[in-house]
Amino acid sequence: MQSCTINVCPQNKCPLLIDVLFFYVCSVDHEVAGKDVVFLLDGSDNTRNGFAAMRDFVQRMVEELNVGENNDRVSVVQYGRDAEAHFYLNTYTTKDDILNTVRGLRHRGGRPLNTGSALKYVRDNVFTAASGSRRQEGIPQLLIVLSGGRSSDNVDIPASALKDNGVLILGIGTRNSSTEVQRIASDPSYAQSVSDFSDLPNVQHPFASSLSHVVVGVKPMTPTVRGKTLLLISTQIMLYLLVPSCT
């Protein structure tokens, strides 16, 4: 955490800023009890050499979560031409079970890469009550997309549908897919680019921070603070996001 020289939060209720995705979030002193986190992994032919790094990234991220039926739930979906869930949000209730399954994930392969269809798949089959989603209970919904190439189908419509359903989308793309991942993400600043997936450890910390301090429903606010844009994040807790960072 890092303290700002000024308190940008209203009524002096949250003096600390938390590093999240290379900007800072000012949070109140309580957090959401749980969240539903879905990892969508590019398993196409393009990522054959990078899939082990993606798998390791998911393991490290899960280690940061407070997994439990009434806490954090996790699902992993792999896609190429088609999408397939390795497990759903209500499949496992312990961190050990999730980690053991993730360690055993194998690259599926396939072409072409249909990221749009995969986004529709997670909306229709994973972020549902039957699959363990608690969206209707007000639990934050997060989707983390890892993509290694440009999609052969449209990504804008299914990504918008997820956002309209209250899903916060974060993304990591390689240089071939970075612009597309920015369009998929809930905000372009929620997307990161790596030269290849072996660089995923370099972005692990900010993404882990984002899982600890969930934000949903971003919209701009005025005025600015010291020339920086103040954004309001709406969820079960109130968070304020300062872009790019406090110095």
Question: Each predicted region: which residue ranges?
Answer:
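Thrombospondin type-1
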Residues: M1-L16
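Intrinsic disorder/low-complexity segments
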Residues: P15-V20, I233
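Compositionally biased, intrinsically disordered low-complexity segments enriched in Pro/Arg/Gln/His
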Residues: L21-F22, L242
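C-terminal helix of von Willebrand factor
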Residues: F23-S27, N114, S177-V225
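Von Willebrand factor
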Residues: H30-I144, R150-I157, I169-R183, N202
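DG-centered beta-turn motif at the end of beta-strands
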Residues: L41-G43, M54, V76-Y79, V122, ...
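Extracellular mucin-like PTS segments
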Residues: V215-T235, Y240-T247
